[in-house]
Amino acid sequence: MTYLVYIVFTIVLTVGLILVSYLLSQAQPDSEKVSAYECGFSPLGDARQKFDVSFYLIAILFIIFDLEVVFILPFASVIHNVSLLGGWITIIFLVILTIGFIYEFVSGAITDSF
């Protein structure tokens, strides 16, 4: 019952704050608000340039290997209590990630030339 009260209170508070924000806001977009701004100067070129796909690829690779650390960290903190099966699962996980990294390196996905 207590959780239901908290859930209802949270929903009512959230909807109430959104309504108050919507009713009190003064949306008046003008040319200055929607124009590009670069350190107080007018932009020299198109301010909305597209990024090269390789930047996104590097970002995705970073996220993948960052998640690897998240998955390995609990194993490293309790390594003395891990069974033989848990150790083999971790080794297989690391081997798969290493093979993936080698494939990315060989295929040219990781280069310094952007």
UniProtKB/Swiss-Prot annotation:
Annotated membrane topology: Multi-pass membrane protein
Subcellular location: Mitochondrion membrane
InterPro entries to which the protein is assigned, alphabetical: NADH_UbQ/plastoQ_OxRdtase_su3, NDAH_ubi_oxred_su3_sf
Disulfide bonds: none
Molecular function per GO: NADH dehydrogenase (ubiquinone) activity
EC number(s) reported in the record: 7.1.1.2
Transmembrane segments: 4-24, 55-75, 82-102
Catalytic activity from the UniProt record: a ubiquinone + NADH + 5 H(+)(in) = a ubiquinol + NAD(+) + 4 H(+)(out)
Keywords: Electron transport, Membrane, Mitochondrion, NAD, Respiratory chain, Translocase, Transmembrane, Transmembrane helix, Transport, Ubiquinone
Superkingdom to which the source organism belongs: Eukaryota
Gene3D superfamilies: NADH:ubiquinone/plastoquinone oxidoreductase, chain 3
Gene Ontology terms: cellular component: mitochondrial membrane; NADH dehydrogenase complex
Function: Core subunit of the mitochondrial membrane respiratory chain NADH dehydrogenase (Complex I) that is believed to belong to the minimal assembly required for catalysis. Complex I functions in the transfer of electrons from NADH to the respiratory chain. The immediate electron acceptor for the enzyme is believed to be ubiquinone.
Family: Belongs to the complex I subunit 3 family.
Annotated protein name in UniProt: NADH-ubiquinone oxidoreductase chain 3
Species of provenance: Allomyces macrogynus
Name of encoding gene: ND3
